[in-house]
C-alpha cells in the first residue's frame, strides 16, 4: 500500500541524535522519492515493490533458479513463495525445468512480465535521471561511490 500523504522533507523536524542522522533521513526519504511513482503504478495492478524487485532481477538474469533469486534478493525461499506465486498467477513469470536437474525451475519473464518490468523500471530511471541532473559529473560520481560503499556492506 502506498501512503498518499505528501511530506515536505524540509519541514520534517526529527531530533538528531548523531551528526549522521540527517544523511540517514535523506537516504530514507530519497529512496521513497525514487520509488513513489513506480509504487503507484504497481499498486494499480495489485502488485508491490517486492514484486518489482523479483521482476527486475529475473529480467537481468539469463536463467535463474528460485534459490538463486532468493539469495540475490536476500530473502528466504519461504518469503519469496507468496509474491512469486502471485507473479505466476498473473502470468508475468514462467519457468522451465533445468536440463539434467529437473527439480530446479529456471525462471523467466513472460512477454507481459517483460513489458511491465520495463515500464516500472523506466519510472524509477526517470526519477533518478532527474535527480542526477541536479548535480555535475563529479557529484554524480561521488553519489555512486557512496552507494557502492553501502552496497559493499552486503559482501
Predicted segment positions?
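N-terminal leader segment of winged-helix/HTH proteins
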Residues: 1-45, 141
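A structural signal for well-ordered alpha-helices, especially hydrophobic packing surfaces
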Residues: 31, 117, 151-154
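Charged, amphipathic alpha-helical coiled-coil/dimerization segments
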Residues: 35, 85-145
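DNA-binding alpha-helical recognition surfaces that contact promoter or target DNA
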Residues: 82
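Exposed, interaction-prone assembly regions rather than primary DNA-binding/catalytic cores
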Residues: 141-155
Amino acid at each position: 500500500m502506498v501512503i498518499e500523504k505528501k511530506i515536505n522533507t524540509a519541514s520534517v523536524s526529527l531530533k538528531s541524535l548523531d551528526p549522521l542522522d540527517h544523511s540517514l533521513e535523506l537516504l530514507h526519504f530519497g529512496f521513497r522519492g525514487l520509488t513513489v511513482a513506480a509504487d503507484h503504478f504497481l499498486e494499480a495492478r495489485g502488485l508491490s515493490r517486492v514484486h518489482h524487485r523479483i521482476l527486475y532481477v529475473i529480467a537481468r538474469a539469463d536463467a535463474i533458479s528460485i534459490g538463486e533469486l532468493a539469495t540475490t534478493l536476500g530473502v528466504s525461499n519461504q518469503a519469496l513463495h507468496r509474491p512469486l506465486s502471485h507473479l505466476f498467477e498473473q502470468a508475468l513469470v514462467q519457468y522451465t525445468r533445468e536440463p539434467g536437474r529437473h527439480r530446479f525451475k529456471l525462471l523467466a519473464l513472460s512477454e507481459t512480465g517483460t513489458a511491465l518490468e520495463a515500464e516500472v523500471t523506466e519510472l524509477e530511471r526517470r526519477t533518478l535521471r532527474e535527480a542526477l541532473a541536479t548535480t555535475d559529473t563529479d557529484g554524480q560520481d561521488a553519489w555512486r561511490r557512496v552507494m557502492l560503499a553501502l552496497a559493499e556492506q552486503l559482501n
